[in-house]
């Protein structure tokens, strides 16, 4: 992911929505995702670098909305919630560049568990991953302790409400001004940005 420099900021609001931006761009892209969802991983593989660059260039504010639709498809029964909590920990304790690095790691084929797999990752293993990625020690400890679990559960509940209001029933979902964007076209982001 392209580095964003010191001007970038990450903020988690009272609804658990994580916003990454430089300044206050007019274009705000809302991305809804679940850490076990294969299409979510494919979306990030296809678009993560371009979205990160658009943030780094100050062209968009990226708002990440965490879901846990697929908790029951994980071996532990709560992997999505714990992975969502880990993203909140990184946002709170590390910073915007680390958030996008962690996002990319969570949705990589190496890390993302398969639906209905016999095993997934424990919180301790996610903490070890943060250490491996050179995250600050307090991030690894918070992830291992599942410190942000309550925040992740609240964020997921708000995600359900937002998607229901928008008439969306699945993730990944990309919305701008509460309207779903067709991300099936290769130029969807450049069209939104205007070039």
Task: Give the ranges of each region predicted by the language model.
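Extracytoplasmic/periplasmic, Sec-exported soluble proteins
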Residues: 24, 39-43, 74-82, 91-98, ...
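C-terminal cap of thioredoxin/glutaredoxin-like
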Residues: 127-195
